[in-house]
Amino acid sequence: GLCLRISSGPDNPIANYLSMMGLSYTRLFMDVDSSPAEGLNGEAYLYGLRTDSLTLDTIYLDVQQDLNGINMLSGVVNGPKPGQEAFDVTLEGNVGNNSAQLLVQYLNARKEQGVYMGVMADLRRHGIRMKVFPEHPTLVYRPFTVNKNNYIYLADNGRIHANLDLHDEQGTGLSFYTNREDTIAKQDMTVELSRINLKEFRRILPYMPDMEGWIGAEAHYIDSGPYMMVSSDLRIDEFKYEGSALGNWELGGVYLPGEAKDHHLDAYIRHDGEEIAHLGGIYLPAEEGTGSLSADIAFEHFPLNVANPFVPDRMVELDGDIDGTLSMKGDPAKPLLNGELALDSVTFFMPEMSAMFRFDNEPVQVVNSKMMFKEFDIFTKGKTP
């Protein structure tokens, strides 16, 4: 048999190396035994895990094997922190010869159940069939209902069959289904999200940024053999980030593969019902290397103030909008940008200095990814540069 025992504090070569990578912990303990007679058994604990943006008090794992398979109990326990309430996340699972299941539970500091939902999987003759349970799972502290005959079947030939409908009484939920009546397409599946309240999900995603809004989305995938298509549409209504209202947003696009192994994408962004950006492009892979990209992106009254909530400590505040078209060509990792951008009433405010800068409305040329501010004026007050 195999026996592995590890006990580690915060001061050793491994801990010191992890500290250089921005990861530290208070104590690590592991005790695992494996033998032909008793199988795999053991436990592990990690205390005081810290990164730049994450602090977790306890992470644990317990594994026991018996005649029915391998049983696992794992989780994260975290006490109250500034701006973050305590929580307890538990993962309970079992892996047998022909089946497996995993159950997730989330409790807050008051032991209120924010999440209670599981997935079971059965090995079938030609694939794996999965099912969501129980019939009334809990999400965002509310009861949901999943259809009794729900399933997601992953076939050996790569096809997916699904019939999953998970919703609550308010219409919030998820649908994932395939069109089995389509005799032409090899694959025809759709995923839909409806009335997802971002503010509610902050209660079960501890380190999620302060966001509010309502999400609706739909993605459709069709594979008819020689041709395939992916289309998607994402809507965020009444969006707020860190308390700043950013309006209504819609992002959509269509992806099509070409006959010469090229990839075509057409996408758009709308803000408060008006299209503010459009992208159309082709990616051509190469037999060696990274391939080449050729795309055009057009801006029409793209508002710059939407970037303000994402600036750390509000060091700067932008206003105004931009118009124009840019072409992107070359290596997808570092394409060259060329084109022209028109700045419309663009201002740049630095609160700490109480300084306001107003940019000239003259078009700015972009040449090989460099903005050419030739004979370009920046005003601080009045009309004098």
Please report, for each region that a protein language model flagged, where it lies by residue.
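Interface amphipathic segments
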Residues: 1-218, 224-385
